[in-house]
Amino acid sequence: MKIEVQYFPLENCSGNLCKIVVEATDYGSAAQIVMNMFNIPQRNIYAVNTYLG
């Protein structure tokens, strides 16, 4: 399913809040994909939601 992940791209949760849509089986996997893509810690993940398009 398509999942929307909102995240802060810089250390200490700074910078503009960003949003990306990824294809994953669950919310945890979607957050992990974004953390790996942008090399950010879990605390930088702001929200994970179902993408409603």
What is each stretch, according to the model?
Residues 30-34:
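Short amphipathic, charge-patterned alpha-helical segments
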Residues 15-25:
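A short, exposed loop/beta-hairpin motif centered on an aromatic-Gly-Thr core
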Residues 1-17:
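Short aromatic-glycine-(Arg/Gly/Cys) micro-motifs in beta-strand/loop hairpins
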